[in-house]
Amino acid sequence: MIAKCGEVRDWHWAHRGTRTCDRWWEPETEWHRAWKNHFPKDWQERIHWSESGEKHIAGVKTERGIVLEFQHSNLRRDERESREMFYQKMVWVVDGLRLKRDRSRFFASLTRASIVKAKPLTYSLPSNEGALLRDWINSHNPVFFDFGEKSEPGDPLLFHTPVLWRLEPRSPKGEAHLSPILKTSFLNKYVRGLALKGIGYSAELRAVCAALLQQAPRPRPLIGFEPYMAMKRRRRRRF
């Protein structure tokens, strides 16, 4: 027995050999369902047919005709390109927590990045920094990395509300341009049709930097002979 999909949106079962499901389909997780539930039911699991008669099911298709694909599993480049060519107007939301080290590597790379724009805040780093960027840098459509609902203490930036990281599809060659986007702004754009708002350096980031300074470890007080030795080092003649 294998999973089968039909015109209805509930998964059911069929004997092998009669499978008519989308070949791009991946097993749905709680992460998929949580994302889809942000959108009206009649936007979810929208069925499309290719000219060759293949059936494809878009995760979400908005009333403005934009397809949102929520990608958890690894995706081959040829399959990604096929989907982008088929749907044209689409964006990707990628689960940044699929592999244990993806998140930590991504945020570690941000500590080596340079800021190329203040409003919206945009970072630039080499496009080969970590598997996530290598896998998605060649996408012709916007990619949003989802690293969960909360910041973690080791993150270079701490936000108090869920944030997605947008990979700019027109990044210069060899570079990846990334911008933090509030999840509420993302949903306002694709549910309500409002403009996507990035995070400006002057307002939100200033508060973030203040929070980072408060959490920075303070120097340990000198004990024992350490004050004496420190004074001697300061007085040591230099040639």
Predicted segments, located by residue:
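DNA- and nucleic-acid-binding/regulatory domain cores of transcription factors and nucleic-acid enzymes
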Residues: 19-22, 26, 30-32
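Non-catalytic C-terminal interaction segments of nucleic acid-processing enzymes
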Residues: 97-239
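Cysteine-rich micro-motifs
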Residues: 7-21
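Hydrophobic beta-strand segments of well-ordered beta-sheets in folded domains
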Residues: 65-66, 88-92, 142
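Basic, amphipathic alpha-helical patches used to engage nucleic acids or provide basic targeting signals
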Residues: 75-97
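Short, structured patches in soluble enzyme cores that scaffold and shape functional sites
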Residues: 70-72, 94-96, 147
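Active-site metal-binding core of divalent-cation-utilizing nuclease and nuclease-like domains
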Residues: 1-4, 31-82, 105-109, 131-136, ...
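Short, glycine/acidic-enriched capping/hinge loops at junctions between secondary-structure elements
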Residues: 5-6, 25
